[in-house]
Regions:
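N-terminal helix-cap/turn-to-beta initiation motif at the start of protein domains
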Residues: 25-34
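Post-signal-peptide N-terminal segment of Sec-exported extracytoplasmic proteins
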Residues: 39-75
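Short, well-ordered, aromatic-rich surface patches in folded extracellular/luminal domains
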Residues: 92-136
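C-terminal motif of bacterial Sec signal peptides marking the signal peptidase cleavage site
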Residues: 16-19
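Positively charged n-region of N-terminal signal peptides that target proteins for export
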Residues: 1-9
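Bacterial signal peptide processing site
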Residues: 21-23
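Short, structured surface segments that line ligand/substrate-binding pockets
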Residues: 69-109
Length: 136
């Protein structure tokens, strides 16, 4: 009986540790390191480039401060089974790599930000609409 109780306690302990993991934050470059943001709508191909530093800083801040981890994983280069999405590409000067992308989309009346192979976050609908409104 003690053996089963020990196994049960070990199982509960491991479960508690994995269930209480820290929430992931979306990873974006610092606004000062970004030279350009390009927002492209898929599948239409409509695009806009943003080079003004104040606007770049606002977009980065809005995305960072208005996302909440869903715990979902991203296993692909772009969202799967999503017909319409925005690709927000961040171009910057860095010796290791020079661009990064975040996909924004709506699914079942909720809005999401997805980084390839990194994760999926909920993003406030107002921020999604503001960024998508830059295409008009």
């Amino acid at each position: 009986m003690k053996k089963y109780m020990g196994i049960a306690l070990a199982f509960i302990f491991v479960f508690a540790l994995t269930a209480c993991g820290a929430k992931k934050e979306i990873s974006l470059p610092e606004a000062k390191d970004i030279t350009e943001i390009e927002i492209t709508e898929n599948p239409s191909g409509n695009a806009v480039k943003i080079t003004e530093q104040d606007e770049i800083a606002k977009i980065v801040k809005d995305i960072k401060e208005n996302t909440k981890d869903t715990g979902g994983e991203s296993y692909h280069e772009q969202p799967v089974n999503i017909k319409k999405f925005l690709a927000v590409s961040f171009y910057y000067n860095n010796t290791e790599r020079n661009w990064e992308v975040v996909y924004l989309y709506e699914n079942r009346n909720k809005t999401y930000a997805e980084q390839p192979y990194s994760g999926i976050w909920k993003i406030k609908k107002e921020v999604f609409k503001e960024i998508s409104g830059k295409l008009k």
